[in-house]
Curated annotation (Swiss-Prot):
This is Engulfment and cell motility protein 1. Pfam families: ELMO_ARM (PF11841), ELMO_CED12 (PF04727), PH_12 (PF16457). Residues 555-676 form the PH domain. GO terms for molecular function: SH3 domain binding. Keywords: Acetylation, Apoptosis, Cell membrane, Cytoplasm, Membrane, Phagocytosis, Phosphoprotein, SH3-binding. Coiled coil: none annotated. It comes from Homo sapiens.
């Protein structure tokens, strides 16, 4: 008799019959189990039957995934994938509109299953669907007026099935005709079309562009930015998301020489202001997928600066040298050039050298040499010229202020601008490809057409202000840059909605404030390094670790919604996983949409006993990170990946929504297995809680009573005459 681990108790349904309770021996071939089930109901030709999950997924059971069957699973006996695919292939060609519609609806649902998808594709099903899209629209054109809902549903189900089938990566995108691309593009270009058809058409175009260079060129010929913009001005956030995704895909795959041209078109069509008005400042919350697409657009826009950032200045190029002359002219407003004589030439050179020194260049004789380092290359000079022309008063004030100071206290504008540009490029990761999972967009960068230049202008004035506050000398240059970086980073974390708000945040982060923050952190560190405190820490640390462990397990009991990602395109598909209250079982299952709150245990179809877990692996050790594809190459996805290994060659793969959830889950799973919690979050929590506990105990030594309840809220004043408007 096989060991209990190989026996799974399930219920099996068959239409028109009572469900059967059955024990499945996982060592038996699947065909033998299906034959046994068919014999129980006296059904012949068992090879025409298969088992599938009876939940909403309806996925077929195969030799590859049969290990996912757990005790208590409800299965359904149904026609085999090959039979089902053959029947649907015939039904969708029916002359009856109702029969065709029902068949396409079933096909759209079943195509999510890779087992069925493979069988349908083997029947050349993809070609059939593309033919229906290409010719079917004309064939039923006359029926639109009298059967418009039916026609719309039919096309919607056809496109849904196509998207699901292609998402499995079985068929190459390069196989599609120009006629099919034109037809899909025509749905996007129409001003009035069914929302579901538009959404799927946008998804298809995005995948075409991302997965095939040839298709990118064909799609780019059929779709213009002007045709996409009306979809951003609507109220449907999903359509807006897919529209921005198509724009991002076109941007990402465009040849280098086309990207700047495309950026100019986006500026002409006022894409930024449309997104700001209809998406960012719309009266609704921005969901994660939209935030991701906005982040991608932000990254791709800033990456246009990479060419200038990596371009060295040519000291012999007169046009480039003229920019430096212009900086000097604006700052010092030379009244008239000396007469062009041999005597005045030396005088002119001397005057230029003096002025270039005042401008803060390292090389006073030939400042062009300052811009030969990449990064930031010519981008620094571009920023300086923008500041001089568009913020002329501030530029002149900074230059003249510093030229009138003593040498050792002057803030060198030229050197500062070059180093600041380099620092801002590092902060914004200019030149790096967008992450698959990040959604860290900044609304303020969508409020101005020249947002990077304006960002620089604010920060160069901050640098000058901080320099004065620090009473810095040239030896303190690197220290000033470190303080400025800290100020900028702290202000950015608050996600200001505009550049003016960003400027206000920086006003509150003066050098004095940064010193207070640093001093507070340093004092806390020093106070807690004495020997008695270290001994006390060591004594209470196990208690704190147990508290952290319980918090991690409680979070696992609450559960988390994870996103399903693949290398081809992002999907709005979700699954949920949570730990049972007794910490014995992990419940998980697919979801149609992102949940609002917790998902009940009974609605999650699959179970994994904690006792079956063999190990938890992370990063590149995860099975789903070893597979070929774009995800393998993405560092940020790699840092969020972890897998649970159980049984033989079975795993449950995760990609956490963010670093915090990654730490929570890896800590919690390690705690379940009796291993140490090693995440950065655990270290931070341990430090915070230890610090708090020690402070409370020290207060107790001083006989200072900590109240159990917060102090009462005082009554409102009798009047508010003391309130005044400071403006």
């Amino acid at each position: 008799m096989p060991p209990p681990a190989d026996i799974v108790k399930v219920a099996i349904e068959w239409p028109g019959a009572y469900p059967k309770l059955m024990e499945i021996d996982q060592k038996k071939p699947l065909s033998a189990i299906i034959k046994e089930v068919c014999d129980g109901w006296s059904l012949a030709n068992h090879e025409y039957f298969a088992l599938q999950h009876a939940d909403s997924s309806n996925f077929y059971i195969t030799e590859k995934n049969r290990n996912e069957i757990k005790n208590g699973t409800i299965l359904r006996l149904t026609t085999s994938p090959a039979q089902n695919a053959q029947q649907l292939h015939e039904r969708i060609q029916s002359s009856s509109m109702d029969a065709k519609l029902e068949a396409l609806k079933d096909l759209a649902s079943l195509s999510r299953d890779v087992t069925f998808a493979q069988e349908f594709i083997n029947l050349d099903g993809i070609s059939l669907l593309t033919q229906m899209v290409e010719s079917g629209t004309e064939r039923y054109q006359k029926l639109q007026k009298i059967m418009k809902p039916c026609f719309g549903d039919m096309l919607s189900f056809t496109l849904t099935a196509f998207v699901e089938l292609m998402d499995h990566g079985i068929v190459s995108w390069d196989t599609f005709s120009v006629a099919f691309i034109k037809k899909i593009a025509s749905f996007v270009n129409k001003s009035a079309i069914d929302i579901s058809i538009l959404q799927r058409s946008l998804a298809i175009l995005e995948s075409m562009v991302l997965n095939s260079h040839d298709l990118y060129q064909k799609v780019a010929q059929e779709i213009t930015i002007g045709q996409l913009i009306p979809h951003l001005q609507g109220s449907d956030q999903e359509i807006q998301t897919y529209t921005i995704a198509v724009i991002n895909a076109l941007f990402l795959k465009a040849p280098d020489e086309r990207r700047q041209e495309m950026a100019n078109i986006l500026a002409q069509k006022q894409l930024r202001s449309i997104i700001l008005t209809h998406v960012i400042r719309a009266q609704r919350a921005i969901n994660n997928e939209m935030a991701h697409q906005l982040y991608v657009l932000q990254v791709l826009t800033f990456n246009l600066l990479e060419d200038r950032m990596m371009t060295k200045m040519d000291p012999q190029d007169q046009a480039q040298r003229d920019i430096i002359f212009e900086l000097r002219r604006i700052a010092f407003d030379a009244e008239s050039e000396p007469n062009n004589s041999s005597g005045s030439m030396e005088k002119r050179k001397s005057m230029y050298t003096r002025d270039y020194k005042k401008l803060g260049f390292i090389n006073h004789v030939n400042p062009a040499m300052d811009f030969t380092q990449t990064p930031p290359g010519m981008l620094a000079l571009d920023n300086m010229l923008y500041f001089a022309k568009h913020h002329q008063d501030a530029y002149i004030r900074i230059v003249l202020e510093n030229s009138s100071r003593e040498d050792k206290h002057e803030c060198p504008f030229g050197r500062s601008s070059i180093e600041l540009t380099k620092m801002l490029c590092e902060i914004l990761k200019v030149g790096e490809l967008p992450s698959e999972t990040c959604n860290d967009f900044h609304p303020m960068f969508f409020t101005h057409d020249r947002s990077f230049e304006e960002f620089f202008c604010i920060c160069i004035q901050l640098l000058n202000k901080t320099w004065k506050e620090m009473r810095a000398t040239s030896e303190d240059f690197n220290k000033v840059m470190q303080v400025v970086k800290e100020q900028v980073m702290r202000a950015l974390t608050t996600k200001p909605s505009s550049l003016d708000q960003f400027k206000s945040k920086l006003q509150n982060l003066s050098y004095t404030e940064i010193l207070k923050i640093r001093q507070s952190e340093r004092m806390n560190q020093e106070d807690f390094q004495s020997r008695p405190i270290l001994e006390l820490k060591e004594k209470i640390q196990p208690e704190i670790l147990e508290l952290i462990k319980q918090q991690r397990l409680n979070r696992l009991v609450e559960g988390t919604c994870f996103r399903k990602l693949n290398a081809r395109r992002r999907q709005d598909k979700f699954w949920y996983c949570r730990l049972s209250p007794n910490h014995k079982v992990l419940h998980y299952g697919d979801l149609e949409e992102s949940p609002q709150g917790e998902v009940p245990h009974d609605s999650l179809q699959d179970k994994l006993p904690v006792a079956d877990i063999k190990a938890v692996v992370t990063g590149k050790d995860c099975p789903h990170m070893k597979e070929k594809g774009a995800l393998k190459q993405n560092k940020e996805v790699l840092e969020l990946a972890f897998s649970i290994l159980y049984d033989s060659n079975c795993q449950l793969n995760f990609i956490a929504p963010d670093k915090h959830e990654y730490c929570i889950w890896t800590d919690g799973l390690n705690a379940l297995l009796g291993k140490d919690m090693m995440s950065d979050l655990t270290r931070n929590d341990l430090d915070t809680l230890l610090s708090m506990e020690i402070k409370l105990r020290l207060l107790d030594l001083e006989n200072i009573q900590i109240p159990d309840a917060p102090p009462p809220i005082p009554k409102e004043p009798s009047n508010y005459d003391f309130v005044y408007d400071c403006n």
